[in-house]
């Protein structure tokens, strides 16, 4: 698995795993029907959102690897390198949404895609769903899949883009819930940040190096810059 595959199109991704391509720029894939589930490392040229329903594979991206629990959502931005490794003896049951940046260009979703900062979270910052949340995510995916099976007409793109946007809005809501339910961990991270900031200022580093970046502190407490920034905004208002 040393070679990194460059997967620029959804059609090429589908061919790798044996999925049917219903639309060149959007796809909903179900890994329990995949013809191939080997071990891969790849850089994808499109957005992807995966709902893991079993612990049947390991996913590595960013700086960390993670054996995802059931009912976990992983969101990956274009250009990230992702590794898939099957876990022997455990069947993979997961469903994924793939959509190319070209598809959302000129849409409401295209104009707001950057607000979905969870696309740049680390693997261990994935979204863990309740049963009710899982049902909502699956319902959104089913609606997108239904549109992909429908004959293309003048409404197709708008309906698909709207349902993708709805799914991402739900993910944002669920992440905000996760920040609340993990408050103890979040407060610990913020306390470490405050100590690091005090040290940075008291030891004269600021005078030499200038004001630190979000990435500087995020790296120190082992969080992605986007997750750390969202955490600070959530806790401080």
Where are these regions (language model features)?
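Short beta-strand His + acidic residue motifs that chelate non-heme Fe in jelly-roll/DSBH
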Residues: 58-60, 82-89
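Conserved metal-binding segment of the jelly-roll/cupin
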Residues: 68-82, 98-101
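A hydrophobic/aromatic-rich effector-binding and dimerization subdomain
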Residues: 87-152
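An amphipathic alpha-helical interaction segment
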Residues: 135-198
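Short helix->loop/beta-hairpin flanking segments within DNA-binding domains
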Residues: 195-210
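Basic/polar phosphate-binding segments, predominantly the helix-turn-helix DNA-binding elements
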Residues: 211-237
């Amino acid at each position: 698995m040393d070679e990194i595959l460059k997967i620029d199109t959804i059609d090429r991704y589908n061919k790798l795993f044996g999925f049917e391509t219903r639309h060149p720029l959007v796809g909903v894939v179900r890994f329990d029907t995949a013809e191939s589930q080997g071990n891969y490392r790849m850089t994808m040229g499109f957005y992807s959102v995966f709902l893991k329903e079993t612990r049947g594979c390991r996913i590595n991206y960013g700086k960390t690897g993670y054996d995802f629990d059931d009912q976990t959502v992983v969101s990956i931005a274009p250009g990230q390198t992702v590794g898939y490794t099957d876990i022997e003896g455990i069947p993979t049951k997961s469903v994924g949404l793939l959509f190319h940046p070209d598809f959302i260009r000129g849409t409401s979703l295209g104009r707001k895609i950057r607000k979905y900062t969870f696309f740049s979270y680390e693997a261990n910052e994935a979204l863990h769903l309740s049963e009710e949340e899982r049902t909502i995510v699956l319902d959104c995916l089913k609606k997108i899949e239904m549109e992909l099976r429908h004959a293309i007409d003048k409404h197709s793109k708008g309906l698909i883009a709207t349902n993708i946007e709805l799914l991402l809005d739900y993910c944002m809501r669920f992440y905000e819930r996760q920040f609340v339910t993990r408050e103890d961990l979040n407060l610990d991270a913020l306390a470490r940040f405050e100590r690091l900031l005090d040290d940075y200022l008291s030891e004269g580093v600021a005078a030499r190096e200038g004001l630190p970046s979000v990435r500087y502190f995020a790296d120190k407490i082992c969080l992605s810059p986007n997750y750390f920034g969202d955490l600070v905004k959530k806790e401080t208002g």
